[in-house]
Amino acid sequence: MLKKRIIPCLDVKDGRVVKGVNFVNLTDVGDPVDAARAYYEAGCDELVFLDITATSDNRETTVDMVRHVADQVFIPFTVGGGIRSVDDMNKMLKAGADKVAVNSSAIANPQLIKDCAEKFGSQCVVVAIDARKEADDSWHVYVAGGRKDTGIDLLAWVKEAVQLGAGEILLTSMDKDGTKSGFDLDMLNAVAQLADIPIIASGGAGNMEHMVEIFEKTPATGALAASIFHYGEVSIADTKKAMKEHGIEVR
């Protein structure tokens, strides 16, 4: 059985780590390289960097950041945001990222998942999905930092992404993002029934109990959190201790 992973998420905007609620009201919480090093030393299993302003203008800033992080952090880390081509992914992997996440660009061009998986291997390709529950109880996929409803059904998109060669799903509940009210267990379980690849749960972590709950009640292999770690509300060591006490295997 895969050991469960605790994964801090660093949303990066203009070279700084930021945090908001429901994808808005962003506040600056520090330098990405310092934050990565602190989390690595605190014992996290992996890191995720999402460049939320990623445009062609600041692509080099991101590559530079990845290089600095790779020099100081010796655990797997994923980079996402603005990855539009095989060449973009190649740059991030060469700079030292272990995995690269695609989101809006994969919706616009699903072939990108296949091309990247064929070139670098599925293990490098993470499909990040932002989803929200609709009035009819289905979930829709959102893009553009969670602002635009694609009208695409979440479960249909998960199935397609897996078939195209995704190696991992990073699933964010936009209803839960930043609320600290717990992960979206229903959505995770629905997705897990269709995806035989690792799933990272994101959106809603508010305390250690939520981190334990996601692993006890869903097949998620990783739990991603931002605010509770950035603001020191919960430590990684305490989270792992709580998980062990509940019989959850951690790294």
UniProtKB/Swiss-Prot annotation:
Say if the entry is tagged with keyword Lyase.
yes
Give the enzyme's main class according to its UniProt record, as a single word: lyase
* Main subcellular localisation: cytoplasm
Keywords (alphabetical) are: Amino-acid biosynthesis, Cytoplasm, Histidine biosynthesis, Lyase
Residues making up the signal peptide according to the UniProt record: none
What are the subcellular locations of this protein? Cytoplasm
Q: Which residues form the active site?
A: D11, D130
Disulfide bond annotation, renumbered to this chain: none
InterPro entries (UniProt xref): Aldolase_TIM, His_biosynth, HisF, IGPS_HisA/HisF, RibuloseP-bd_barrel
State the reactions this protein catalyses.
5-[(5-phospho-1-deoxy-D-ribulos-1-ylimino)methylamino]-1-(5-phospho-beta-D-ribosyl)imidazole-4-carboxamide + L-glutamine = D-erythro-1-(imidazol-4-yl)glycerol 3-phosphate + 5-amino-1-(5-phospho-beta-D-ribosyl)imidazole-4-carboxamide + L-glutamate + H(+)
**Which EC numbers does the record give?**
4.3.2.10
Q: Which GO biological process entries does UniProt record here?
A: L-histidine biosynthetic process
Subunit comment? Heterodimer of HisH and HisF.
Family affiliation:
Belongs to the HisA/HisF family.
Question: What's the stated role of this polypeptide?
Answer: IGPS catalyzes the conversion of PRFAR and glutamine to IGP, AICAR and glutamate. The HisF subunit catalyzes the cyclization activity that produces IGP and AICAR from PRFAR using the ammonia provided by the HisH subunit.
**Stated name of the protein:** Imidazole glycerol phosphate synthase subunit HisF
| Organism, scientific name | Streptococcus mutans serotype c (strain ATCC 700610 / UA159)
